[in-house]
A protein has these predicted regions:
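N-terminal phosphate/diphosphate-binding loop that engages ATP/GTP or pyrophosphate donors
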Residues: 3, 19-94, 98-102
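Inter-motif core of Ras-like GTPase G domains
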Residues: 123, 137-160
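Phosphate-binding/switch loop-helix module in NTP-utilizing enzymes
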Residues: 80-136
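Short internal beta-strands
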Residues: 39, 155-158, 183-189
Length: 239
């Protein structure tokens, strides 16, 4: 089976999805896979400077045009649907699906936030609507829906410390309900702390979910050394 890439999602905001995504991209590049990156939506950014998307592109070593790397960029730091509607715009999932389908190399798709974050509104098809309820309305589409459409192995990034057991278990359950392939849960340390739960959380997440769990590694302050350390952490995903 051809290796197509990964769909990276978080269990929460601020868990370090982009860090893990960069590490995976860099590892794929090291293997000579010439990876591509796709951040479908980035919010809280200037339209010409989506920082997370550009960081992914740099790790890939690619020269993707900005509109293929990050087709939707919004200034408001909010969920994609909220940010889009604040600007009177909409996110077209068919455009995103097309970018993945046309990719000629493994692609890493980084979601904006967690699995249930709202991305867009789509009209209900006629067979989804009860005529007694009146004309068709719209349904909210989430990152989980996008993951289901793309059918890429999912890398779920969670915080290393307190609170991660519940977040990871709920996210894994959501993936299982859609029969989506979970490549791994990656527990990431985003700051130095003395949280006593860090040492055992990986074992508990594995026991509770049955998922493959990577990490957490030690926190590394230096950005370059941190990328190298995370690259070693995710090496088993790529080889």
């Amino acid at each position: 089976m051809t290796f197509r890439g990964f769909f990276v999602a978080g269990t929460d905001t601020g868990v370090g999805k982009t860090e893990i995504g960069r590490a995976i991209c860099a590892r794929m590049a090291l293997r000579g896979l010439h990876p591509l990156a796709l951040k479908p939506v980035e919010t809280g950014c200037e339209p010409d400077r989506p920082e997370d998307a550009l960081a992914l592109r740099e790790a890939c070593g690619s020269s993707q045009p900005l509109d293929e790397l990050c087709p939707y960029r919004f200034r408001l730091p909010a969920a994609p649907l909220v940010a889009a509607e604040a600007e009177g715009r909409r996110v077209d999932l068919l455009r995103i699906e097309g970018l993945v389908q046309r990719a000629k190399a493994p692609i890493l798709v980084e979601a904006a936030g967690g699995l249930m974050v709202p991305l867009a509104r789509e009209p209900l098809s006629i067979d989804q609507v009860d005529p007694a309820d009146g004309p068709p309305s719209a349904v909210i589409v989430t990152n989980l829906d996008l993951a289901e459409r793309l059918q890429l192995p999912v890398v779920l990034v969670g915080r290393a410390g307190l609170g991660t057991l519940n977040h990871c278990a709920l996210s894994v359950e959501a993936l299982e309900q859609r029969d989506l392939l979970l490549a791994a849960v990656v527990l990431n340390r985003t700051q130095p702390d003395d949280d006593p739960t860090v040492a055992s959380n990986a074992r508990w997440v594995a026991e509770m979910t049955g998922a493959r769990v990577l990490g957490p590694g030690p926190f590394v302050a230096d950005a370059r050394q941190r990328l190298l350390a995370l690259g070693e952490l995710v090496a088993r995903l790529v080889g």
